[in-house]
C-alpha cells in the first residue's frame, strides 16, 4: 500500500486544513477510501473520522508545437480524531 501513496500534498489550502486536523495525500487513482483508511490507522496508529477524495481535472499543457495534458491523480483528505496527529506533517 505504501507504494500507492505518491506524496503528502502541501499547498496553501492543505496547510490551512492542518489546523482543522485534516491531512492531504496524493495517491494512485486505483486506491479506494476503505483500504486507505485501514492503511492510515495501522501505519500511523491514529483514529480516522472521515475521508474525502477527489480527482482534479486535467490541465492542458503545451511545449512548443506539442500539446498534451497533465497526469491525472487522486487527492485524499483524511480527518483525524482530535488529539491525534501524523508526525509526517508536523511543521
Swiss-Prot record:
Domain of life per record: Eukaryota
A matching Pfam family: Ribosomal_L23
Subcellular localization(s) per the UniProt record: Plastid, Chloroplast
Chief site of localization: plastid
Gene3D superfamilies reported for this sequence: 3.30.70.330
GO CC, any one term: ribonucleoprotein complex
One BP annotation, GO: translation
Keywords noted in UniProt: Chloroplast, Plastid, Ribonucleoprotein, Ribosomal protein, RNA-binding, rRNA-binding
InterPro entries: Nucleotide-bd_a/b_plait_sf, Ribosomal_uL23-like, Ribosomal_uL23/eL15/eS24_sf
Molecular functions per Gene Ontology: rRNA binding; structural constituent of ribosome
Quaternary context: Part of the 50S ribosomal subunit.
Role, per record: Binds to 23S rRNA.
Similarity field: Belongs to the universal ribosomal protein uL23 family.
Name of the protein this chain belongs to: Large ribosomal subunit protein uL23c
Amino acid at each position: 500500500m505504501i507504494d500507492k501513496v505518491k506524496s503528502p500534498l502541501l499547498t496553501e489550502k492543505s496547510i490551512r486544513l492542518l489546523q482543522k486536523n485534516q491531512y492531504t495525500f496524493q495517491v494512485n487513482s486505483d486506491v479506494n477510501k476503505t483500504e486507505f483508511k485501514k492503511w492510515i490507522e495501522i501505519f500511523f496508529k491514529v483514529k480516522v473520522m472521515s475521508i474525502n477524495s477527489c480527482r482534479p481535472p486535467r490541465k492542458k499543457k503545451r511545449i512548443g508545437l506539442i500539446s498534451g495534458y497533465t497526469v491525472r491523480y487522486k487527492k485524499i483528505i483524511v480527518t483525524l480524531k482530535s488529539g491525534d496527529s501524523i508526525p509526517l506533517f508536523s511543521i
